[in-house]
Amino acid sequence: MSNNSVVYWGTGRRKTSVARVRLVPGNGTITINGRPGDNYLNYNPSYIAAVKAPLETLGLSSEYDILVNVHGGGLTGQSGAIKQGAARALCELSADNRKPLKTEGHLSRDPRAKERRKYGLKKARKAPQFSKR
């Protein structure tokens, strides 16, 4: 990567994962925490598709490299965070990209997270066995 090339940044979050995504002009390679993207995501096709989805929505999958620093959570949360971060970086690239990404749902934060455990219960909603007598 040359020093004068343009870099677009985006931050994504999902569950407890946070991803800092950089879009750099290139040939479509994905690097996550210094490792190849498919290797990092255990060659899982749904995770890889989620990461590539924003670029494929705009037809730019072979024009930009994705460089990611991600931490927290598991692979599901991390791939979702990378997807949102890449979409935000694409919005920084051009304001015209926002509408198609928004209609596909790549820009919205998924609010689903682990529910906290309550006292008196075994798990978030599982109650101890009820005995009538």
From Swiss-Prot:
Residues 95-113 have a biased composition (Basic and acidic residues). One of its GO terms (cellular component) is cytosolic small ribosomal subunit. One of its GO terms (biological process) is translation. Residues 94-133 are annotated as: Disordered. GO terms for molecular function: RNA binding; structural constituent of ribosome. Residues 114-133 have a biased composition (Basic residues). The keyword Ribosomal protein applies. This is Small ribosomal subunit protein uS9. Belongs to the universal ribosomal protein uS9 family. It comes from Synechococcus sp. (strain CC9605). Keywords: Ribonucleoprotein, Ribosomal protein. It comes from the Bacteria. It holds the Pfam family Ribosomal_S9. InterPro entries: Ribosomal_Su5_D2-typ_SF, Ribosomal_uS9, Ribosomal_uS9_bac/plastid, Ribosomal_uS9_CS, Ribsml_uS5_D2-typ_fold_subgr. HAMAP family: Ribosomal_uS9_B. The keyword Ribosomal protein applies. NCBIfam families: PRK00132.1.
